[in-house]
Amino acid sequence: MFSHFLHVFSSVPQKRIKKVFYKIKYSELMFFIYVCVKKQMNYTTYLFDFDYTLADSSRGIVTCFRNVLNRHGYTRPTDNDIKRTIGKTLEESFSILSGVTDTRQLAEFKKEYIKEADTHMTVNTVLFLETKSVLAALKDSGARIGIISTKFRYRIKELLDQHFPEDFLDIIVGGEDVQTPKPSPEGLLLAIRQLHATKAETLYIGDSTVDAETAQKAGVDFAGITHGMTTAEELKKYPHKKIMS
């Protein structure tokens, strides 16, 4: 289960890992042993995508899209069709799923989706089993951690506030914080600036080709995770340090 993040943690200082190791459940022993023997790297800042990287919100996303699409007579898209749009903007996703290109209609779909999400999203979103331990270990190691997502920041915080202390993450950049969404590097570069980090010491972790392209455009290293609908083969087409399955 924890193999997804093995490569990411290869840069955590070994002495600090030993200090936090005893806070982690025994089932993660092999994970941390692997980390301790890995070659040291120079990352101090770890920025994550959210959906399909740290959390599985697919049930909530499918429910919200389905309710809006059905309301307007678009019943053909399957659940997998909807899941394949995760990581894109709402306007892009609705255009793909409905064929609609009119910006006013897409804006109305988005408005309806947000209203649906107020009811269905957070309650239908779960963190991946390793997420808490991975973020806690990084935090305890002294690394800077954050999230870069097309999802609204307040929506991400709704879930994280149930699991972490306030301001546990150093930064969350959501869809409302940027002018141009991923794969524009705007959000990623914004986080790097605000954290007073450098590109060379930053690793971006995500599950989609949108994330891979974002890292490439920002000029930062990328690690891919196949938690979602994107295959390892698709991710490998982009510069990467590691693709984890």
Segments the model singles out, each with a brief description of its role:
Residues 203-243:
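Acidic, Mg2+-coordinating phosphoryl-transfer loop and its flanking beta/alpha structural elements
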Residues 76-81, 105, 167-171, 199-203:
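Short acidic capping loops at alpha-helix termini that bridge into adjacent secondary structure
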Residues 42-132, 137, 141:
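N-terminal helical cap/lid subdomain that shapes the substrate entry/recognition surface
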